[in-house]
Amino acid sequence: MLLGSLSSGWAATTISATNQFAYGANIGWINWHADGTNGAVIGEFVCSGFIYSANVGWISLGGNAPDNGFQYANTSASDFGVNHDGIGNLRGYAYGANIGWINFENTGNPRVNLQTGVLDGHIWSANVGWISLSNAFAVVKTDSFFPGGDKDEDGIPDQWEYLQTNDIEILSDEGHDEDGDGVSDVQEYLADTDPLDANDNLRITAHSVLFEDAKESHILTWTSRPTRFYKFNIADNFNPGFTFTSINILIPPAPGSTTTEKADLGVAADQRFLRIEALRPLSP
């Protein structure tokens, strides 16, 4: 099962109104929420919007329009910004007229926790030194990850389409399945699988059932991605009008290409049906 939704165009800040401040010893507090409209936007692929310092003014994280469609090259003043690699690492450059370039680099290791949205690590400015994204007094936290625009309104972020196909005209909605693997292009995005590879899709690869003390447990292994979280969905039958019920335990992906997890279902039943639900980080 694959769930998700998209917004299009420019986004208001994704930063929490209560957890919004970074700190630098030589610059003071920096507000990532800013005025709520022009504040920082942490995206699935790139960051955009502005952060604000009372001492140096507005600092741009990027314009949300990288030349290649999915990530800033950071090789020119017209194509700069902070990239998100999808697994939490933030790399690239921010810029402010009164502070110059701010480097999101490996030594400071700026990153965002995909499960909590909390930013951590440090960013570097040649003019003011290190800026901490979290400390004992304050943290920066994003409430969501902006998927980016969807110009062709097919339910797939343009940035993901450019990443996968270098175009936005190849993948489509209405059940279109570019690689013919039985999984639609939209579902491939929601699971972050390759829409051009028929062997790459979200699927259960192993399943076993345990009965002990009249209780039932299922152990499932499925294909997984480091960019997604998962939940078990359960149904007792496939009769008309049946529904799946989600077990509200968020399962992080294991290292590697598959994840194995146990679902304890309580009192054993005559039959049960299970499926795996893929979730974008911080999605409802």
Regions found by a protein language model. Name each.
Residues 148-284:
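Short, composition-biased motifs enriched in small/polar/acidic residues
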Residues 4, 8-150:
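Peripheral, non-catalytic segments of secretory and membrane proteins
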